[in-house]
């Protein structure tokens, strides 16, 4: 009988919502390193070179290693590539590196058998290890038929495990949302439950066979699906007496700022809850460029260790595994069913006009200082003690001003008339006082701030305290950073990581990013909107779901991404998948409007949703064909 998730219980077996501790996992021995347990969170990447080209693979692997990579993965799509891992391994060892090498296998279990002879770890994909490649067809299985399919997996997987035991080879059970088998999809749907069950089917065999050098990954280009699936996996493993180490990554994250922000939202949300033993940031860039991004994320979250305890009580109705948006009453355009708002600072009297209309903040905070010019129709937040004075000035005609109060000014809220009022609160403010205030003033939006070492736990604590009191005032999370403009990437990673769990938990009615440094205000605004889009909460631009490339990619991926972006960047709200090959292509493009997928050497197939509409187009004209397809659908 297949495993059933049955009735869901709200359990907190693995996670303290308010206090950071790293999840206790077993240890996987992978060549010269150990992964999991008390070992450092390992950083890794994957080559993009042809695995039959030994020299190129050795060179690129060593670039990754020199950048700080602790594991290096190679695509092994056939037995020839798997056999050549022997030469690649020898070349890297001859240069004095003992870094473990990982073979990435899809579709062919025989290739995994060969790779296990020459690599320290082999990744297999449950979606295509024994199950045939998905065709997105509907097929009902009886329990007996389903059990027969599971037996087929065990009959093929156990001999592979025996090879791994003999050669001291570790494995990764790597589930990709985009390559779930039709069997799983038909039984569980395209859901986190299906993703987790796909993984557990293989883990149960490992446990039964007493094979413990196992690492697990669950990846998706959808950050919400990725985080919820990994949370559910942790919970289900605990129920079944498993605690294997976890590999984190957002697949097909893209490149540049968008790729970094999307990766940080997903990976950061899990790391902040103590989940994760190794990280790969999948960027459509040079593999070595992934390493410092992953390292900064891991180090940033690691600063939470040893923080002062946050004594808080979780709201009983909150479901960490399947969170829904916290119920709030709309105050103006904040909360209720409104998309989360963006608040931004302009406190030095500078212009409040915004060049990027798609990243214009919903509210601009100006403190107590008049800007050079008020923008017609723009919402402004001003300090409560100058609100009435500024609101009466003729210069503000056509603009909308709203007061903000610090916690100590709560008694004055009733004396000032405004449709929307803002109140800054931090966990630890006397609860009786602020709860009474918020109950009396439903027009107040809470600005949740924190200077705690673990600001995620601190900010969660305030909102859970509000939920326990039955308050329905909207909450905007405000975060302060200190970075110069040369540290823009660090700012974006930290902000996305801090906001990730809060957004996926359904607690966010708005975000307010601040920086004590010279990062331009427009960059901060664009980052805020990018974070909301990465968390699937608000769309402000074209979205690109692009893979990082690997040895299977047979066209110039980065050049193609640049061409497609340049030609489609004005198509706000459109999702375009750009995939090197068909391994995850159609699946990871599940909610993409269009897809550009490698089909062979310099050949591309085009998709509308998950349906292939043009096959094997020459690469040199494929972008033009994609644009023509998009244009034809507009008509």
Label each residue range with its predicted role.
Residues 14-45, 161, 165, 303-350, ...:
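N-terminal amphipathic alpha-helix/helix-capping segment at the start of soluble metabolic enzymes
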Residues 16, 69-201, 344-355, 360-456:
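Active-site beta->alpha loop and helix N-cap motifs at the rims of alpha/beta catalytic domains
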Residues 140-153, 184-334, 420, 429-571, ...:
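Catalytic alpha/beta core domains of metabolic enzymes, predominantly
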Residues 70-71, 119-135, 273-287, 506-519, ...:
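Glycine-rich phosphate-binding active-site loops on the catalytic face of alpha/beta enzymes
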Residues 43, 104, 173, 216, ...:
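Conserved, mostly hydrophobic/aromatic
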Residues 52-63, 108-112, 263-267, 350-356, ...:
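Short, acidic/polar
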Residues 40-56, 101-108, 184-196, 252-261, ...:
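Active-site mouth loops of central-metabolism enzymes
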Residues 296-345, 367, 378-412, 419-422, ...:
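Extended, intrinsically disordered, low-complexity segments
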């Amino acid at each position: 009988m297949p495993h059933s998730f049955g009735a869901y219980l709200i359990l907190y077996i693995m996670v303290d919502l308010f206090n950071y501790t790293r999840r206790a996992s077993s240890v996987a021995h992978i060549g010269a390193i150990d992964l999991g347990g008390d070992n450092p969170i390992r950083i890794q990447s994957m080559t993009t070179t042809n695995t039959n080209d030994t020299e190129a693979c050795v060179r690129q692997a060593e670039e990754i290693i020199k950048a700080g990579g602790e594991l290096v993965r190679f695509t092994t799509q056939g037995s020839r590539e798997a056999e050549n891992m022997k030469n690649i391994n020898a070349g890297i060892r001859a240069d004095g590196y003992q870094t473990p090498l990982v073979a990435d296998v899809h579709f062919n279990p025989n290739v995994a058998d060969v790779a296990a002879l020459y690599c320290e770890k082999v990744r297999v994909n449950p979606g295509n290890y024994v199950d045939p490649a998905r065709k997105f067809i509907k097929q009902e299985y009886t329990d007996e038929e389903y059990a027969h399919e599971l037996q087929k997996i065990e009959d093929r997987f156990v001999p592979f495990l025996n090879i791994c035991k003999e050669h001291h080879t570790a494995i990764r059970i790597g589930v990709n949302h985009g390559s779930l088998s039709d069997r799983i999809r038909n039984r569980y749907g395209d859901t986190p439950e299906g993703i987790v069950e796909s993984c557990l089917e293989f883990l149960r065999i490992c446990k039964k066979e007493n094979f413990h050098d196992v690492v697990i990954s669950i990846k998706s280009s959808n950050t919400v699906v990725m985080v919820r699936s990994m949370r559910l996996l942790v919970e289900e493993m605990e129920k079944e007496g498993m605690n294997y180490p976890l590999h984190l990554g957002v697949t097909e994250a893209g490149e540049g700022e968008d790729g970094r922000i999307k990766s940080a939202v997903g990976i950061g949300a899990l790391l902040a809850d103590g989940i994760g033993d190794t990280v790969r940031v999948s960027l459509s860039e040079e593999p070595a460029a992934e390493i410092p991004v992953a390292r900064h994320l891991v180090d940033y979250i690691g600063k939470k260790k040893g923080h002062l305890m946050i004594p808080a009580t979780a709201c009983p109705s909150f479901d960490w595994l399947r969170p829904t948006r916290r119920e709030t009453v709309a105050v103006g355009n904040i909360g209720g069913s409104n998309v989360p708002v963006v608040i931004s600072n302009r406190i030095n009297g500078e212009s409040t006009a915004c060049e990027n209309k798609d990243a214009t903040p919903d509210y601009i905070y100006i403190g107590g200082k008049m800007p050079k010019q008020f923008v017609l129709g723009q919402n402004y937040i001003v300090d409560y003690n100058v609100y009435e004075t500024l609101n009466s000035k003729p210069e503000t005609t056509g603009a909308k001003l709203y007061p903000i109060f610090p916690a100590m000014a709560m008694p004055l809220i009733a004396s000032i008339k405004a449709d929307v009022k803002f109140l800054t609160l931090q966990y630890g403010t006397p609860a009786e006082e602020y709860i009474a205030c918020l109950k009396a003033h439903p027009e107040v939006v809470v600005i949740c701030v924190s200077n705690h070492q673990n600001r995620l736990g601190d900010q969660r604590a305030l909102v859970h305290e509000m939920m326990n009191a039955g308050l329905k005032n909207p909450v905007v999370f405000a975060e302060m950073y200190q970075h110069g403009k040369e540290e823009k990437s660090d700012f974006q990673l930290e902000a996305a990581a801090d906001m990730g769990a809060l957004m996926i938990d359904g607690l966010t009615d708005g975000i307010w990013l601040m920086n004590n440094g010279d990062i331009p205000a427009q960059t901060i605004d664009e980052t805020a909107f990018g974070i909301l889009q990465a968390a699937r909460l608000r769309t402000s631009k074209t979205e690109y779901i692009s893979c990082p490339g690997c040895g299977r990619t047979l066209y110039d991926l980065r050049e193609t991404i640049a061409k497609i972006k340049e030609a489609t960047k004005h198509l706000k709200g459109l999702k375009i998948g750009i995939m090197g090959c068909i391994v995850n292509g159609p699946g990871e493009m599940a909610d993409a409007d269009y897809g550009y997928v490698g089909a062979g050497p310099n050949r591309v197939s085009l998709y509308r949703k998950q349906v292939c509409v043009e096959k094997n187009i020459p690469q040199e004209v494929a972008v033009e064909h994609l644009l023509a397809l998009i244009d034809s659908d507009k008509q």
